[in-house]
A protein has these predicted regions:
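SH3/SH3-like beta-barrel superfamily modules
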Residues: 202-234
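Boundary regions of SH3-family modules and the immediately adjacent low-complexity/disordered segments
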Residues: 70, 153-185, 192-195, 199, ...
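Membrane-embedded alpha-helical segments of integral membrane proteins
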Residues: 103-144
Length: 241
C-alpha cells in the first residue's frame, strides 16, 4: 500500500501498489493519516533499510514535506523516480515541492527521455531486440526461401537493439556524470574553497538542487541553477546515488 498524498491536488488517500512485507508499513501509513508526520517519517526510514521501494521513498517524501523538510522530501521524490521513473504522482509532488520553494528546474529533453526508463529497463529492451535479431538471422539461415520475407524484420530489430544499447550506455553515463545533491539544512554556506576558514561566498537554502562537480574530504564542489559554484560541507546536502 502506498499513501498517495498529491501535494499538487492537496488530497490524501491510499492506493494499492506492490505489497510491503510487514505490518510496520501500514503502521507508518496510519501515523501519516493521523498527522504524526515526523513519526511516520521515522517509521518509513526504518523500513527503507530492508526494502527500498518507490512507494516507501514516495511516502517518506510526503512525510518529510509535511514535517517542514522540503530538501529531504525532494531527495526522496528523486529516489522514487529512480525506481519508478514514469510515476506521475512522484513527479507531480516533486514539481509541487519545487514550486513551493519558488524554484523551477528546466530538465533537458534528452535527459528527460533517458529517465523515462531505468537502466534495467533499457537493458531488457536491448536484450529483447538483440535476441529477436539473432532469432531472425537464424531463421533466415534455416529457411533460405523465407530470408527475403524476414529481411525487413531483421533490420528493424537490429536497429532496435543498437538504439536500445546506445540508450543504455547513455543512461549509465548520465547517472555517473550528472551527480545531484539536495540541500537538507535550513541554510548551507557555499565557500570558494574546501576550507572552513574560507568566507562564505553565498548560501543555498533547504531544498536547493545542485550539480556535484567534485569532492574532497568532507566537502563537495557544487553548482546551482544560477551557475554559481563553490564548496559545501557534505553534511549540509544529501547526494543522490
Amino acid at each position: 500500500m502506498k499513501i498517495v498524498f498529491l501535494l499538487w491536488l492537496l488530497v490524501a488517500s491510499v492506493w494499492p501498489v506492490v505489497a510491503q512485507p510487514s505490518s510496520e508499513f501500514e503502521a507508518a501509513n496510519k501515523l501519516f493519516e493521523q498527522g504524526r508526520f515526523a513519526d511516520a517519517a521515522a517509521a518509513y526510514e526504518r523500513l527503507l533499510t530492508n526494502s527500498p521501494t518507490a512507494a516507501l521513498h514516495f511516502n517518506l517524501g510526503n512525510a518529510r514535506f509535511k514535517s517542514g523538510q522540503p530538501g529531504k522530501a525532494i531527495f526522496h521524490y528523486h529516489q522514487a523516480l529512480r525506481l519508478s521513473p514514469r510515476d506521475p504522482d512522484a513527479r507531480g509532488n516533486l514539481q509541487f515541492a519545487r514550486r513551493s520553494l519558488g524554484v523551477t528546474v528546466d530538465e533537458p529533453l534528452a535527459r528527460h527521455l533517458l529517465r523515462l526508463h531505468t537502466p534495467d529497463e533499457w537493458a531488457r529492451l536491448a536484450g529483447a531486440g538483440l535476441g529477436a535479431w539473432f532469432l531472425l538471422l537464424a531463421l533466415g539461415e534455416t529457411l533460405p526461401a523465407k530470408r527475403a520475407a524476414f529481411a525487413w524484420l531483421t533490420k528493424t530489430f537490429g536497429v532496435i537493439a543498437i538504439v536500445s544499447a546506445s540508450l543504455l550506455a547513455a543512461a549509465h553515463w548520465e547517472r555517473r556524470t550528472a551527480g545531484l545533491a539536495v540541500v537538507v539544512v535550513p541554510e548551507a554556506a557555499v565557500r570558494p574553497g574546501p576550507l572552513a576558514e574560507s568566507k562564505a561566498a553565498f548560501t543555498l537554502r533547504d531544498g536547493t538542487e545542485a550539480v556535484v562537480l567534485d569532492a574532497k574530504d568532507d566537502w563537495l564542489h557544487v553548482r546551482d541553477s544560477g551557475q554559481r559554484a563553490g564548496w559545501v560541507k557534505r553534511e549540509s546536502v544529501w547526494r543522490l546515488p
